[in-house]
Amino acid sequence: MKILIKEVLTVLPDQRKIFTVQECNVYIEDDTIKAVIETEKKKETRAPFSDKTADYVISGKDRLLLPGLINAHSHIYMNFMRGCGDDLAFDDWLFKRIFPIEDKMTDEDVKWGTRLGLLEMIESGTTAFIDMNLNMLPCGEAIEEAGLRGIISRGLVGAGPDDEEAIRRIKETMEAREKYLENELIEVCMGPHAPYSCEEKLQQYIAELAGEYNMKINMHLSESRKEVADCKKKYGCSPIELANRAGLFKNRTIAAHCVHVSEEDLDILYKNRVTVATNPVSNMKLGNGVSPIPRMLKKKINVALGTDGAASNNTLNMFHELSVITLIHKGVSEQAQCISAKEGLRMMTTAGAKAMGKEYEIGSVEAGKKADLILLNTNTASFMPRNDYIASLAYSCNGSEVDTVIVNGRILMEKREVKTLDKEKIFYENEKIFERLTK
């Protein structure tokens, strides 16, 4: 299918990968951006097709075109748990509220919870994500229905490779890998849960398995002070040092949280090219603190932006996360220039693409990349007066401005209508699940 997005203000990367806004014609053919032509240079550049030969034309009037947003850390199935463990300390929230509910969940519960999360993602402009979930096959089926792009993992737990639960979950992971090996939109990775749930021997085994099958690692690390203290007491090192010692970082790794980290930890992350997926809202809401993002950026660590799950955030809306990441570090550092709007936008686009290992495929509006794009309505109070679009994205937008979502050249939402999911059915089923599982 040939799609032309005509005369639209477009957020583009320049040669320094700093975002600029230019009016462009954007040409999509099948799943790929064929050309991005600035309107003032239209006569000088040959377009791949015209508005007369396009199969579909989208007007750029009052619209801003962005690369699709990338959520670097999520638990999409948790959306039905929104509000069931608020204002609790991390350990009480996780062990007394979340894990007991998860133990009762069926495959259908996982699928419906995942559908709700995917719906929220589409409506707020997320087109790709890195997720840790329960029951990977029903989760994958929901993602296929929705049409989003994702890397999925099962939280792997246990004392070692002979642990019964570890065997079951690794088997599930490998079955999902086999199913989605040729799938263009879904990739399966290894998900050692955290150092308090996935012990060193199991981490070592997962590292070897990931290396053998060329799989990425998705893991929670150094999320709370207690996690770090317990790890040092048990293993004599920090969670990041433990993961490195176990060999996990020999594989491309996404380390979620990394709130309580030493300079030695940061050196390990940089040396091993580990991406940090920072989740500022979840970290603050659970009382875990603020990750030292400016120090990470100074060390040239790739930092991408995530939401965590709706049980701890309580939203998967990346515009909310963008606002917080840009504001919290200005306040903590007492420096207004700390984490600019453009830096925050980079974290949820190009840095997220790098976290996924897809920096040459997605994350920016460029010819040759996959057509993962979103259009925002700028004829809204949050954009007025329309003088600095990127600042508006960070400081005044709330996600309701997202009008159209395209993934892999397929229109998933247009004029705020999601085409791939049944919203009313999803709402109905999730309210039933919440009532049953939280009695």
Describe these PLM feature segments.
Residues T10-E23, L286-G287, A353-I390:
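Acidic, glycine-enriched loop/beta-strand segments at the rims
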Residues R82-L148, R169-E182, N430-K439:
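Alpha-helical scaffold segments that flank or form the walls of functional sites
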Residues F80-W112, A146-P161, A166-I167, R225-R252, ...:
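Active-site gating loops and adjacent loop-to-helix segments of metal-dependent hydrolytic enzymes
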